[in-house]
Amino acid sequence: MEIKCILKCLIDSQTGTSQTTGNQWQSDEWLVVVPGPREKKMVFRVRGVERCQQWRNFFDGMPDKNVPVLIRFEIDAHENTQKPGQWFNTIEAWDISVTSW
């Protein structure tokens, strides 16, 4: 899936070490806005140390923070293991590029 929007800000970042592999991990949450008569907002996650750094570099390198971007992402539903029968969605982005309206 993809969305044209404005990348507003990094809202949360988590890091740690995998208990099984010992590798470092990172997960960032970003906020985007789709302008219009009824402005829409979406929060999504970017995973992986390298990918998170790429997104931060992309955002920091944008001279105009109101430039539209194209974000490609996946949505997936997961069942809550603590409460069977309850589900939640994850939105994970994997690509970003500057675009135009």
Question: Which sequence ranges carry the predicted segments?
Answer:
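Single-stranded nucleic acid-binding surfaces, predominantly the OB-fold ssDNA-binding core
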Residues: 1-101
